[in-house]
Amino acid sequence: MKIHLFFFILLFWVTILPARSNFDPKYRFERCAKVKGICKTFCDDDEYDYGYCIKWRNQCCI
């Protein structure tokens, strides 16, 4: 059981933690504005999720 916990933590460390953005919130919003995106909670079916805006729940939809 301990080996499963170890592999789960290792998997979390390798996949989830690097996916966090290192940009400050200001730069994340400016990046969305550069591509003429709109910050929304959820993107529609015909929109592309470009990344996160200032709040982590808001997505930049193009």
From Swiss-Prot:
GO MF terms held by the record: CCR6 chemokine receptor binding; chemoattractant activity
GO aspect biological process, one term: cell chemotaxis
Principal cellular location given in the protein's record: secreted
Coiled-coil segments: none
Position of the signal peptide: 1-21
Location within or outside the cell: Secreted
GO cellular component, as recorded: extracellular space
Keywords, in A-Z order: Antibiotic, Antimicrobial, Defensin, Disulfide bond, Secreted, Signal
Residues annotated as transmembrane: none
Taxonomy, superkingdom: Eukaryota
Disulfide bonds: C32-C60, C39-C53, C43-C61
Listed Pfam families: Defensin_beta_2
General function of this protein: Has antibacterial activity.
UniProt similarity note: Belongs to the beta-defensin family.
Protein name according to UniProt: Beta-defensin 110
Taxonomic source organism: Canis lupus familiaris
Gene: DEFB110
